[in-house]
């Protein structure tokens, strides 16, 4: 990195990784800006703290399925995974009951058995990071483990899919990226949807993916406008994951990156350098414009 970032011909970087590393890269590029022949193009795809927001009109079964798939596929080890959920009080008990039941149905094991929904997390570092978030939640008086919460690294790095309910909408697991099978939910008053929208928009520095689940069309349209800066990929009545390269341009803003939409022609525009060429076929031979000859 140091060799590239200090070279006079350095022209750009397309980075996928953590927000912290991307910030450090940007800082290094800024310090070296006087060395470059041109201003570098900088594109970043970084972290996420992706949300599912349910409206009081939402079908509980749709909410539960979106959470089970969105939070726990690939053990939550993708930047688009659902990590925080906002559930209205009128359907909260049903959602929690079915969510817990669904998690308990998951089979956990190695990847050779395709019937296993949950596998090990990628390595010991990731395992320890996820475990410390779960341990903190266990000690937090405002948090309750609804299901899961156990970890085992005797053979492989296995973390039970874990659902946490918090009474504090700004608790650690509602704000920070975990990158593991941990979902935190907050129950909000069903009559105060606008407050929930504010929480979704302001709680996390990230803005990668998110979804609204509702049957009320006005609520969907309202959320789509209010959360326009909260998610670069916004899903309606679905989980906040699964963008298909070439069909659904992917990327987010704020601390999630530069929102240059990988997998689409929008991204390619960042790497173009437009050049305008003019050729005159009847060049002038007198500097005087016609109006200068007027009397």
What are these regions (language model features)?
Residues 6-8, 12, 18-169, 190-194, ...:
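ALDH superfamily catalytic-core signature
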